[in-house]
A protein has these predicted regions:
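A glycine-rich beta-to-alpha transition motif near the start of alpha/beta enzyme domains, typified by
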Residues: 1-112, 152-198
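Short acidic-hydrophobic surface loop/beta-edge motif
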Residues: 4-6, 93-95, 130-137, 143-145
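Short, solvent-exposed secondary-structure boundary/capping segments
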Residues: 112-120
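Beta-strand scaffold of nucleotide-dependent catalytic cores
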Residues: 118, 143, 197-198
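Ligand-binding beta-strand-loop-alpha-helix segment within the catalytic cores
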Residues: 121-128
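Glycine-rich, charged/polar anion/phosphate-binding loops
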Residues: 128-129, 138-141, 170-172, 182
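Internal active-site segments that recognize and position negatively charged phosphoryl groups
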Residues: 134-161
Length: 198
């Protein structure tokens, strides 16, 4: 199987061009390639596939093999891959996802994609404002937002001291989120600036 590993601000996936390749069991392949010590090491597997309703289709599998609906950083890499490898030949494209069709606007320089902007659609609030959750004996307030996939935004006083490798999975797999959730931890610096860790 030919693959490409790409990352968008550190969110790394293994990408397979399914215009040319076939992946028999993508859930299992995602688990194998995501293993950071014995596999390739990634946050998951993304398949770039033909689509009947868009320029291409993105299927995203998390490192545990579950299929996710969308990933903003992942879809930006899909756009770059699709253009740079000739799947598309225009700077504005549509990509089918489980979270709906997303529209990408790419800046091209020297025949290659330099930046990709994604129209994620209008975010939908998915919880009361704010909602409380308890993890590891700590009660935190969060705001639930859906941008094609679920996010929980937590406001904290100090993002630098957070052990994200420990607390991230605890929030992601919390019973409050039966379909898992992406967690963002935010410190408000002032009215115009935030500090965030994902």
């Amino acid at each position: 199987m030919k693959f490409t590993k790409m990352q968008g601000i550190g969110n790394d996936y293994v990408y397979v061009n399914c215009f040319e390749e076939h992946v028999e069991d993508p859930a299992r392949v995602a688990q194998l390639v995501s293993e950071r010590h014995f596999g390739i090491g990634s946050d998951g597997l993304i398949l770039i596939c033909p689509s009947e309703v868009a320029d291409c289709r993105m299927r995203m599998f998390n490192e545990d093999g579950s299929e996710g609906s969308m990933c903003g950083n992942g879809i930006r890499c899909v756009g770059k891959y699709a253009y740079d490898h000739g799947i598309v030949d225009k700077p504005q494209i549509s990509v089918e996802t489980l979270g709906g069709i997303k529209y990408l606007d790419m800046r091209i320089e020297g025949g290659k994609v330099k930046t990709v902007k994604v129209d994620m659609g209008i975010p939908q609030l998915t919880s009361e404002l704010p909602e409380k959750i308890q993890v590891d004996g700590k009660k935190l307030e969060f705001t639930g937002i859906d941008v094609g996939n679920p996010h929980a935004v937590y406001y904290v006083d100090d993002v630098d001291s957070l052990d994200l490798e420990k607390i991230g999975p605890a929030f992601e797999m919390h019973e409050r989120f039966p379909d898992r959730v992406n967690s963002e931890f935010i410190r408000v610096i002032d009215r115009r600036h935030l500090q965030m860790r994902v």
